[in-house]
Amino acid sequence: MKNVNNSKVKGLLRNVSVVKRTAHKRLVWIGMSVCATPLAWAQPKTVDQDGVSLTYDSGIFSKVEIIELKKQPLPDPHDRLNVHPANLLFVFYANAKYVGSIKLYPLEDRSEENLRAAYPELLPNTFALARLITDRPALPLRYPSGNPKEIPTIQNQMAEQYFLSHARYIDFSWGSGVGFLVQYSQDASEYAVGSRLDYQIEGISWDKSIAISANFEVAHPDLPPTKKDGTIRDKNGDSIGEAAYMKYLAKMEKFLDEKNEASFNPPLDSIQRLVGSLQFKNVDSSGWGSKFDGKTTVIE
C-alpha cells in the first residue's frame, strides 16, 4: 500500500515541475509584483538549521524560534486530533507577540513502514494541493451558490475556510504554491472580516520532498475596526442571519481583492518574500522522524 500511494502522489508531483519551466510565461504579473518590492531587508538576518535556511528582517521580527517537532503518528499519537510527521517549525514574534509561522513537512518518513497508516491525511492533502498547483484553475473555485471552495492545506486545520480573498499561485526558487487571505472558524459565529484574518501560503518543493505551510496574521487599514474574534451584529446587537452574512462575506471578499498587496499590514508581498527566502541544502527530511525530539532554538 505504501508504494502504491507514494507513487500515485509522486506521479502527480512530477507534473508540478512542469510549472517551474513554464511559470515565467504564465505568471508574468507575479514577477511584476515582486519586482515592485525592495529586494533587500532593512536589517537582514539569516538562520540555518537542519540544512534549511531563511532570511528575515530583524527590524520587523524581534525573535524567531526554530522547533524540531516530534512526529505524532497513528495509532498512538500524543494528540489524536493533531497527527503529523516530524517537521521543522519557524515561529516569528514582533515585540514578544506571535505574528506567524512557517512549517516544513517531510513527504517521506523512513522511520514509518506505512506512511499512509501513520499519517492518513498527509498524502491525500498533498495530492489535492499538487493537483491545484499543477492545473492552476482560476481562484477561488466556487460552489454553485457562489461561496468559495476551500484551498487544500497540508495539515488539517480542524476548522472551515469561510472567507477567502487575494488567492493566487506563486512560484519560488524552491518550488511552487498558492497564497491566500483566509479566516477560519470552528463554529457558526458571524465573525467580522479582519477579526481573525491571516495570510497563508501552501507549497511543495520542486524535488517533491518537502511541503511548506506558512501562516501570518494580517490587517488592513481600510477595514472597519473590530476586536479579535469580533462578530457582525445588526443595529439591535442581534445576529444578522446566514443569508445576510453570506452577502457580507462576498462584499468583503471583493473589497479586499481590490486592495494592493503592499497596502496590508504586513504587506503580503513581504510574507511572500520571507517564504521565498527558504533554501534547502543537503536536507534529509525523510530522516526527521527518527531525529527530531522537540528541541527549540531561539534567535533574538
Predicted regions and their residues:
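N-terminal module-boundary/linker segments of secreted carbohydrate-active enzymes
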Residues: T55-I60
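Surface-exposed amphipathic alpha-helical segments
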Residues: V218-E300
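Sec-dependent signal peptide recognition
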Residues: K25-M32
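Signature of long, low-cysteine stretches enriched in small and polar/charged residues
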Residues: R80-N82, A128-S209, N215-P224
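A short acidic-to-branched-hydrophobic micro-motif
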Residues: V64-I151, S213-V218, D222-P225
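N-terminal secretory signal peptides that target proteins for export/translocation
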Residues: M1-H24
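Boundary at the C-terminal end of the N-terminal hydrophobic targeting segment
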Residues: A40-P44
